[in-house]
């Protein structure tokens, strides 16, 4: 009898302990659910090379603790890979232009640099790149300074030359140092394709200020044909931040050299706007890479792009830059309203001029985004 009572008591104690654990789990879930309600979710979208991942890194630098030494060092192979990839694109591009261009002679690499060029092109085509040594950096610098390579670089928009090319080529000595640790600028310029989903949580006014919203920012990678698989997972996000590289109106895609990048951006923006899961979602459009755009538009007319074929230049210099930018901005505004259902026209839509590499501008822009979304929340709560 005593044994039975003892067992019964143990079972009751076990049940009580289990019930207490269940209650604690439920309490934590409830607390986390409440906490989640106060987090505004933002989704970063954009076509390849739009600069959205650079925006993501800027947010980490601006509103979090930035990159620690281990994270900075993890970018060493990325930076070195960018260097090798860049010099290969330029070398191979010069050979192609030397064979096919009308004025082909200026794209012929000098005899003394041809062997160096072949060697570096072979390295750039590998799956695994060697660490950048002083010797290799000197050879890359020699080839970079070759007149044919400089002529080729001037036509970089035709050859998939990355935006980071000039920056890394001008810093080869530092990048090849045996004790090299990437700077935050190196990390911002470094180009690596986003795969999967990465996220960070931040507040533009600091975590300790009660008035500040807390945001969770998602950067999503993936090929064009994979978008339909994951887009619905972000139903209910507070806002979509769509990055459009306005400087790329004369360039083609990496994955499809017959497809203009601006046309790809137009089609992606239109597709995202029409998604049912974003019917009540705010849209923040970042017209990115303005720093490149303002230089390019004075030399390459906007109307080389099919979408901008009705563009007519009106002036030169700063006035022409402003005119061209306003034209592009209006095109995106028209596309937004054409692609937005009548019952969704009251959702928030804002356009911001952006340069992802300009930290002060990114900080200012995100303060404006924060202010816009906080006002929307107050309005929906009936407090405005």
Swiss-Prot record:
One term of GO molecular function: G protein-coupled receptor binding
Name of the featured protein: Guanine nucleotide-binding protein alpha-1 subunit
Keywords: GTP-binding, Hydrolase, Lipoprotein, Magnesium, Metal-binding, Myristate, Nucleotide-binding, Palmitate, Transducer
Keyword set includes Transport: no
GO cellular component terms, semicolon-separated: cytoplasm; heterotrimeric G-protein complex
Region (G5 motif): 354-359
Binding, GTP: 49-54, 163, 188-189, 194, 222, 288-289, 291, 356
Pfam assignment, any one: G-alpha
Span list, region G3 motif: 215-224
Annotated region described as G2 motif, given as residue ranges: 186-194
Superkingdom as given in the UniProt entry: Eukaryota
BP GO terms, sorted: adenylate cyclase-modulating G protein-coupled receptor signaling pathway
N-myristoyl glycine: lipidated positions: 2
Coiled-coil annotated residue ranges, if any: none
Lipidation (S-palmitoyl cysteine): 5
UniProt lineage: Eukaryota, Viridiplantae, Streptophyta, Embryophyta, Tracheophyta
Residue segments, region G1 motif: 41-54
PANTHER family, alphabetized: GTP-BINDING PROTEIN ALPHA SUBUNIT (PTHR10218), GUANINE NUCLEOTIDE-BINDING PROTEIN ALPHA-5 SUBUNIT (PTHR10218:SF302)
């Amino acid at each position: 009898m005593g044994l039975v009572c003892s067992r019964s008591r143990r079972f009751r104690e076990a049940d009580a302990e289990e019930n207490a654990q269940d209650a604690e789990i439920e309490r934590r879930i409830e607390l986390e659910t409440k906490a989640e309600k106060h987090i505004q979710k933002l989704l970063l979208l954009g076509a390849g090379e739009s600069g959205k991942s650079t925006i993501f890194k800027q947010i980490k630098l601006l509103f979090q603790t930035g990159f620690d030494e281990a994270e900075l060092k993890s970018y060493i192979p990325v930076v070195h890979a960018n260097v090798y990839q860049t010099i290969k694109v330029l070398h191979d591009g010069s050979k192609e232009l030397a064979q096919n261009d009308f004025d082909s002679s200026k794209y012929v690499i000098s005899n003394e640099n041809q062997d160096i060029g072949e060697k570096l092109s072979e390295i750039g085509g590998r799956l695994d790149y060697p660490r950048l040594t002083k010797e290799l950096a000197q050879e890359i610098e020699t080839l970079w300074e070759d007149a044919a390579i400089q002529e080729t670089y001037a036509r970089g928009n035709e050859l998939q030359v990355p935006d980071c090319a000039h920056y890394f080529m001008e810093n080869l000595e530092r990048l090849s140092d045996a004790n090299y640790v990437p700077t935050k600028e190196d990390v911002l310029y470094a180009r690596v394709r986003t795969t999967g989903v990465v996220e960070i949580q931040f507040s533009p006014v600091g975590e300790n200020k009660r008035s500040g919203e807390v945001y969770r920012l998602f950067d999503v990678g993936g090929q064009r044909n994979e978008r339909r698989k994951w887009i619905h997972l972000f139903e209910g996000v507070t806002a979509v931040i769509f990055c459009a590289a306005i400087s790329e109106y004369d360039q083609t895609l990496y994955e499809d050299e017959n497809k203009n990048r601006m046309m790809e951006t137009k089609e992606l923006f239109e597709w995202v706007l029409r998604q049912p899961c974003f019917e009540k979602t705010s849209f923040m459009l970042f017209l990115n890479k303005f720093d490149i755009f303002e230089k390019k538009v004075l030399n390459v007319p906007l109307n080389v792009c099919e979408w901008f074929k009705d563009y007519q230049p009106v002036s030169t210099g700063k006035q022409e830059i402003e005119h061209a930018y306003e034209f592009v901005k209006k095109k995106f505004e028209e596309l937004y309203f054409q692609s937005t259902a009548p019952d969704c026209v009251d959702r928030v839509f804002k356009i911001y001029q952006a340069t992802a590499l300009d930290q002060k501008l990114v900080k200012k822009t995100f303060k404006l985004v924060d202010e816009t979304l906080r006002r929307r929340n107050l309005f929906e709560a009936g407090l405005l």
